[in-house]
From Swiss-Prot:
One of its GO terms (molecular function) is tRNA binding. Its EC number is 2.1.1.256, 2.1.1.-. Part of the heterodimeric THUMPD3-TRM112 methyltransferase complex; this complex forms an active tRNA methyltransferase, where TRMT112 acts as an activator of the catalytic subunit THUMPD3. SUPFAM superfamilies: S-adenosyl-L-methionine-dependent methyltransferases, THUMP domain-like. Keywords: Cytoplasm, Methyltransferase, RNA-binding, S-adenosyl-L-methionine, Transferase, tRNA processing, tRNA-binding. It catalyses: guanosine(6) in tRNA + S-adenosyl-L-methionine = N(2)-methylguanosine(6) in tRNA + S-adenosyl-L-homocysteine + H(+); guanosine(7) in tRNA + S-adenosyl-L-methionine = N(2)-methylguanosine(7) in tRNA + S-adenosyl-L-homocysteine + H(+). The gene is THUMPD3. InterPro entries: RlmKL-like_Mtase, RlmKL-like_Mtase_CS, SAM-dependent_MTases_sf, THUMP_dom. It comes from Bos taurus (Bovine). This is tRNA (guanine(6)-N(2))-methyltransferase THUMP3. Residues 170-286 form the THUMP domain. Residues 157-172 have a biased composition (Basic and acidic residues).
Length: 506
């Protein structure tokens, strides 16, 4: 059997997830080699947090991890039974299985020759094992279309300022009930039968699915043809071709090889062609939408990605019983991510804007509803609270906070750069008051690096900069600063100064 025939046979049933729960576990016997199939997984991560993501992979999967020279990507090897755990990683945005990697691809001198090589490349690649992973991955990936149905109702709830939360909870429950991703990932760990089902699907060549397809083929003369698209991500200045040209010619060759149907929007398979200078990686996407789309259902004008929030929290290494505060929480992305991953700490989400506090509270409520649907019982709650306050006058005791993690106003969509010159020093001063001397730390994200550097220079006796991570947020070059609280005690400024906090100025 040729490689293309084998790959096609593994893809007979597109709707695997809809039929997974009806598959019966066969008699236990010798496990096939396919069950122990090892592949390389690629993941996109927030730029600057590649090392953080690599550390999480080593910690949770026990796999060695390689950081790509192409910023924002990591690679690691797994076996099939670890696939569900990969989808539970908190620091990765998108996942793909590597078909083949060319570390030093030799591009020809002319565009015509390069594109001709791309056409010939499609028939030379080892597609079989990656397509097996793609097939079983459909049981774990989140469905993009079902999330879109929820968004219009969520927007209406924002206008109502939190009224009608029952409708939102019903929509969340409906979404979670119809989706297999979260519940089946949980069942994968707790129920050995699910693991056996996965093994059966791979080891026995998707026997049950093929049987069902054969029954359907009696009604339909031809099996459904898979739809696909090719996406080319290219970085480098020495290429004589464009991304569209590479995707077009390589995609045409893939279509001729598999006899699939090209569809740029409603596709089943997304083939990736990643090019960075002389490094070429061909892969198959394992996520329909970024994994950072979790936790948040009520969005604000500046909602931080959950993957970036996780990276910021991990930078400060939370310990059990730590009190972690986000004094400018917005939608609550950071404290919600913290309460989910570090449940042995206590998290406080605060903001001076009542709408932001309301959004954070609604996001916490939605997360509790999600947990209730997943576990089938009322959750005990999360170690998190919300409060409205003034960042320059926090209602917290001096030296009572272990960690401060926050996304500071950039002065773009929120606030202004002019106000930041007064706001940043006042924020750092108040943060130094509530943070524990000697052991306290702060992780602060800002794009207004010049203003922050000036404010920090005047706080050298209270804060010491330990590390800086350069990140890209929506095209803006920002920085995440890890600060350590010095042992020096905080001294209140004299009342004679009469300094007004910029947070309260109108």
């Amino acid at each position: 059997m040729s490689d293309v025939q084998e790959a096609t046979n593994q893809l007979l049933d597109v709707n695997l997830c809809e039929n997974q729960m009806s598959i019966q576990v066969t008699e236990s016997g010798p496990r096939s080699e396919s069950e122990h199939l090892q592949v390389t997984i690629g993941a996109t991560v927030p730029t600057g947090f590649e090392q953080t993501a690599a550390d999480e992979v080593r910690e949770k999967l026990g796999s060695s991890c390689k950081i790509s020279k192409d910023r924002g990507k990591i690679y690691f090897d797994i076996t099939v039974d670890s696939l569900a755990q990969v989808h539970c990683l908190r620091s990765v945005d998108n996942l793909f299985v590597v078909v083949q990697e060319f570390k030093d691809y030799q591009f020809k001198e002319t565009k015509e020759e390069v594109l001709k090589d791309f056409e010939e490349l499609a028939g030379k690649l080892p597609w079989s094992d990656p397509l097996k992973i793609w097939k079983i991955n459909t049981c774990f990936k989140k469905k993009k279309t079902k999330r879109r149905k929820l968004n219009p109702n969520s927007s209406k709830q924002k206008i109502d300022n939190g009224r009608g939360d029952t409708t939102v909870e019903k929509d969340v429950k409906k979404e979670l009930t119809n989706s297999v991703s979260d519940s089946q990932i949980s069942d994968y760990y707790e129920n050995p039968a699910i693991k056996e089902q996965v093994s059966t699907l791979i080891g026995d060549g998707l026997t049950s699915c093929k049987d069902e397809t054969e029954e359907n083929s009696k009604e339909e003369a031809d099996p459904e043809v898979l739809k696909f698209r090719v996406t080319c991500n290219r970085a480098g200045e020495k290429h004589c071709f464009s991304s569209n040209e590479a995707a077009r010619d390589f995609g045409g060759a893939v279509q001729d090889y598999f006899k699939w149907k090209a569809d740029m929007t409603n596709f089943d398979v997304e083939v990736l062609l990643n090019i960075h200078d002389n490094e070429v990686v061909v892969g198959i996407a394992l996520t329909e939408e970024s994994l950072h789309r979790r936790n948040i259902t009520h969005f604000g004008p500046t909602t931080l990605r959950s993957t970036l929030a996780y990276g910021m929290l991990r930078l400060c290494a939370p310990q059990p019983t730590d009190i972690i505060v986000d004094p400018m929480c917005g939608t609550g992305a950071i404290p919600i991510e913290g309460a989910t991953e570090w449940s042995n700490c206590y998290h406080i989400a605060g903001d001076n804007n009542p709408l932001a506090v309301n959004r954070a509270a609604n996001n916490i409520s939605s997360l509790l509803t999600k947990i209730q649907v997943k576990e089938g019982k009322l959750p005990l709650g999360l170690p998190i609270d919300t409060i409205q306050w003034d960042i320059c006058n926090l209602p917290l005791r001096t030296g009572s906070v272990d960690i401060i993690v926050t996304d500071m106003p950039f002065g773009k969509r929120m606030g202004s750069k002019k106000r930041n010159w007064n706001l940043y020093p006042a924020c750092l001063r108040e943060m130094s008051r509530v943070c524990r001397p000697g052991t306290g730390r702060a992780v602060l994200l800002t794009q207004d690096k010049k203003c922050f550097a000036k404010a920090l220079s005047g706080m050298g006796h209270l804060w010491r900069k330990v590390h800086t991570v350069w990140v890209n947020i929506g095209g803006l070059h920002a920085a995440v600063y890890l600060l350590k609280r010095t042992p020096q005690s905080f001294v209140h400024p004299s009342e004679e100064d009469g300094e007004r906090c910029p947070c309260t100025q109108r």
